[in-house]
Curated annotation (Swiss-Prot):
Family: Belongs to the FlgI family.
GO terms under biological process: bacterial-type flagellum-dependent cell motility
Signal sequence range: 1-29
Protein name: Flagellar P-ring protein
HAMAP family: FlgI
Gene this protein is translated from: flgI
Amino acid sequence: MTQRPFSLLSHLGRICLAAAMLAALPAQAAERLKDLATFQGVRGNQLIGYGLVVGLDGTGDQVRQTPFTQQSLTNMLSQLGITVPAGSNMQLKNVAAVMVTATLPAFARPGQTVDVVVSSMGNAKSLRGGTLLMTPLKGADNSVYAIAQGNVLVGGAGASAGGSSVQINTLNGGRISAGAIVERPVPTSFAQDGLVYLEMNNSDFGTTQNAANAINRQFGAGTAMVMDARVLQLRGPLDPSQMPAFLSQIENLPVTLAPAVAKVIINARTGSVVMNRTVTIEEAAVAHGNLSVIINRQNQVFQPDTPFTDGQTVVAPNTQIEVRQEGGALQRVRTSANLADVVKALNALGATPQDLLAILQAMKAAGALRAELEII
């Protein structure tokens, strides 16, 4: 007989270790503006293309199940002047149809290289050792902006023999470092008549106003104006040649962060609990119980009663499941003014992260949790 108790997850202290370390940080920190915001219009553009990877060691697409691979290969060969007879059934195992994606950065110029991601779209077993053939990469306007080609680097590993196989990470995708060459630039317009818009990464009136104050102190009143909780309007030089120097100084200005919104993030699937340093709790009383599941399994053997017959010995599992829930005692949670005190108070409950899901929700409903509760 084997006994397998299903214990709950470890205590909150292990889950909230990263959150507790944040308590040692200062209440307000100054960061560079470039880490908090981006200039409107300065962004990357997504590119996509369809291509073929060749040179695989028998791990390519099975063309009977992926006819588009054979069709693509036939079309490519015809462009190279090679005619494949109609109705030919090429049983190739070293070719795979793939989708190629890349991000064209802002201000990219012809001749610049970018990384590409290669992903199998058929039933290829592995792209290891393959070479991507010349693949046009198009943007949303269906125009070609880059050409990709090169050897695919696959991060996974695997082997199979005798019907058994082992695999580490995925083998159906890889990357080509500097695998695409930019052929056409994307027009980038971010300054008109000296006006530039700065977009904060997070919507916060306090931080946005602090950024405007820092800019106005450096360049004079009226240089920055808050449009809303996320957008700043900047008045820069009218001469386009002076705009890069102006924006470079803007990016490196230190900005004091406003206190963040108190928030607790709970992952209901994994039991992870993360909270920021502005979370506080009021005094409350909490009672919780522990749930345990015990499974007992015993194999019983049944043999035929009459010897020398066609009866067979049968092994039948006998499984018993027992659920136990221990009563919880009412415990007092004291008022906590900072993250370290919050973690200490919740640890004193002895609750597991799974129990903490219900406890935090109940504390929020009772008004004892001074934070926004978000369950993902």
